[in-house]
Amino acid sequence: GLLKAALNLHKFGINKLVVIGGDGSLSGADELRDKWPQLQQELLETKQITQQEADFCKNLLLVVMVGSIDNDMAETEMTIGADTALHRITESIDDLRSTAYSHQRTFIVEVMGRNCGYLALMSAIATGASVVFIPEAPARKEWRENLCTLLDAGRNAGRRDNIVIVAEGAKDTEGNPVTAADIKDAIQSGL
């Protein structure tokens, strides 16, 4: 892991890194930076690098940028990748809507984002989705009945399509996951 990364950086004379990623990438880069002196010493002692290579790479300099479609990093307005992900989601939902409309269907779209409902909420607003489930607003205990009532009322009012968006980390107020399969089962049994 880290020792091999340090070896490769020394062998290629790389002492500056730009890391763009999410929690795992940024944590890994921070750990590499923290352990750099010990890794370098081990590489010297085992004669895997020369003193000249060690001197050139004495300090490891990092520039880190948050790149995460989840848009869940504090102190950033928008993470690299979130806007592109939102754009792709809204395009995909727009493509689904014509089929949903022409066949009078309900489509359930599960959106990535782990425990952050940003993509689900923003895509629901952008596409005029019927319902959205997000982790930040847990669904009430009676969400299944409420969902069916809402969708039925829309059909009775002449709505030909329904789009239900669920964030992958959505839960109910008791902490139970709310998944696309759960929503499908609720609609099939309740309508």
For the regions a language model picked out, list residue spans one by one.
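Glycine-rich nucleotide/cofactor/substrate-binding loop typically near the N-terminus or early
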Residues: G1-F12, K16, D55
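Accessory alpha-helical/coil subdomains and C-terminal extensions
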Residues: N8, V19-G21, S27-L61, T79-L191
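Beta-hairpin (beta-strand-turn-beta-strand) motif
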Residues: G22-D23, G67
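Alpha-helix N-cap/helix-start and coil->helix boundary motif
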Residues: S25-L26, D70
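Gly-rich Lys/Arg/Thr-decorated short loops/hinges at beta-loop-alpha junctions or inter-strand turns
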Residues: G67-E77, S102-Q104
